[in-house]
């Protein structure tokens, strides 16, 4: 059940290996459980060929290690600031822009956080490293802009 009170912003730490979502409620700082009772979600997507669907986090790793046919994609954050972000990759037999791949994962973080918190998050604070790309201010700014664009595309207003 969704809360009737106004939504507050969440904070997303989109990490290379793991991601977390936090929520500041009045007087309470909370890291939100994203997978079972765990506050981290491995930054992994597995596209299961048999079931023609993406799975995320520990389940993605499990299905991959169990030998399901598909494609495992890790370290998604490393796409930010790279030239690959402007290209497509093959997923379940079709071309998918890498930017859309990032959107799938970040949308999953948003969806899981909202389900656990019982409310929608319309605003987000996106964590970022000091530099997405060392010694290249333009690529670093492009990485930040891409992350912001992805957040807006999946429904964050600010």
How would you label these PLM feature ranges?
Residues 27-157:
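Phosphate-binding loop and its immediate beta->loop->alpha context
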Residues 2-31:
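Gly/Thr-rich phosphate-binding beta-strand-loop-beta motif of the actin/hexokinase/Hsp70
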Residues 1, 157-158:
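Charged, flexible boundary elements
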